């Protein structure tokens, strides 16, 4: 379950027009949400409050062998943020839970419109966040600054009495088709560069679908530790598309780390509006070791309720998990305009020209009908996800190499966001040192950790 402060940060990004899915850091977010979801450990209780439209506070208390607590405060000068931040009673479960990330292709009209409108509508905004942990007296701070529509500066700092303080700076530039990121950290003098390039969607000869709703992205990262002179790098390919017959989205990724010889491929598909399946295969070229992981989530619907009308975006805007396309529903209800031919603006010519236009319309009529059908099928499936009021979700993942099973339940009850789960492992039991050499304890399926987390916000 997403913490309240993380929800405010994502709402800030959405309000300022920043797309977190167009970053190399989140290029494999879908498979990670389904396979490597976080299972709570111990008992954690979190209470949050929006005291003013620009200030937010959170108090957290946890009990994992010892009692810990934290107090967080967030301030932002972003205008209109209250339209995106929801309390625990009103927030949709698919927005509060980490799940499948829907990626829409970015066409040239999007970047042109964002650049022209951004100069008129965009206003610089900033976000300040701080959290103090007790009893360790560890301080966590973050500053996010949006100076222009395409740039973002992020500074993160952790100060602790027991360990050395760490300061990390991020400078990000997102032009739509390319997203570049420069990173500098005081931890080992780490310097990094990330880039993600989106290939503009176009009709492929190998693609039999007329309505091309696919997205192909290729990115990489370079890291270098100045103090220990250690390099690191990786590259990833991501392909997102929809089934033309059912409208169901799927995502494929292929990652490669040439220094360590690690190759990873993932396949994630939303089989229905209430079920998602993901698989991952890892292979090392040097050690010849491999691993196969599976994960899924199953959603249960609750009572139907009317969505908040303020969460609407234009039809031709890039899609995110929380986007709502009100104009799509209006056009879908109205239906296509059958009386308007394809080249109606050229019908005022001669008789021979009109005959030629009529022949063209007859020739391409079947193709146009197929395009409209495929587009409406995809949009109908997306609208079913946006309009759904889910009450709970079950998440499961397993790994053949590690022989573990993760189980997580997330839901809403009486205004509370509840997350409860356990991780079962097949590792052998640890024996005392005086009995370690006598016999081997057989591996048993036992809970490695379990816990529950409750969140309440107003």
Curated annotation (Swiss-Prot):
Pfam families: MDM10. Residues 307-339 are annotated as: Disordered. This is Mitochondrial distribution and morphology protein 10. It comes from the Eukaryota. GO terms for cellular component: ERMES complex; SAM complex. The gene is MDM10. The lineage of its organism: Eukaryota, Fungi, Dikarya, Ascomycota, Saccharomycotina. Signal peptide: none annotated. Lacks alpha-helical transmembrane segments, suggesting that it resides in the membrane via beta-sheet conformations similar to those predicted for other outer membrane proteins and porin. Component of the ERMES/MDM complex, which serves as a molecular tether to connect the endoplasmic reticulum and mitochondria. Components of this complex are involved in the control of mitochondrial shape and protein biogenesis and may function in phospholipid exchange. MDM10 is involved in the late assembly steps of the general translocase of the mitochondrial outer membrane (TOM complex). Functions in the TOM40-specific route of the assembly of outer membrane beta-barrel proteins, including the association of TOM40 with the receptor TOM22 and small TOM proteins. Belongs to the MDM10 family. It is a multi-pass membrane protein. Keywords: Membrane, Mitochondrion, Mitochondrion outer membrane, Transmembrane, Transmembrane beta strand. Component of the ER-mitochondria encounter structure (ERMES) or MDM complex, composed of MMM1, MDM10, MDM12 and MDM34. Associates with the mitochondrial outer membrane sorting assembly machinery SAM(core) complex. It is found in: Mitochondrion outer membrane. Disulfide bonds: none annotated. Residues 326-339 have a biased composition (Basic and acidic residues). The keyword Membrane applies. Its main location: mitochondrion. One of its GO terms (biological process) is phospholipid transport.
